[in-house]
Amino acid sequence: MDLCNPKEIKALLGRHGFRFSKQMGQNFLIQEWVPRQTAEASGAAPGVGVLEIGPGIGPLTAQLARRGEKVVSVELDRTLLPILAETLSDYDNVEIVPGDILKTDIAALCRERMPGLPVVACANLPYNITTPVITALLQAQCFQAVTVMI
C-alpha cells in the first residue's frame, strides 16, 4: 500500500470509517519525499531506537522502521490504531503505544521499550502542540537527536 497516495489513503480511511479531528490538528503526509527525507535526517539507523510521536497512518513510521532498530510510536487517536495495525503489519520492529505523549514519562518509555539502545525522536506535529512536545522531549534528556516537522 502506498501511504502517500491520496486515492489509497482515502480508500483506507473510508474502510475504517475514519474522520479527521480539527481538535487534534490532524494532517497526513501525502508527498513520498517528506517522510523519506525526515527519516533520513532523524538519525534512525541499525542499533538505534526511535520514538515517534503521532504516527497518523504510518508513512513516516514505515520509513523509520526501515532504518531503525526499533520504533516506538505514541498515538493519541485510538481510532487510528486499527489503521496502523494494517499499514504497519510488515514491520515487526514497530510498537504502537496508545496514549498522550504529554502525559507520558518519556524517559521511562524509552528505557522500558528500547533498553540499551541509543534513542532519537522524530515527529510530524500539529502546530498547536509543537512547543509543549518539544519541551517534553528536551526535558526527557534521553535523545541523541530530535527531528520535528511542523
Regions found by a protein language model. Give the residues of each.
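Catalytic cores of RNA-modifying enzymes
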Residues: M1-I150
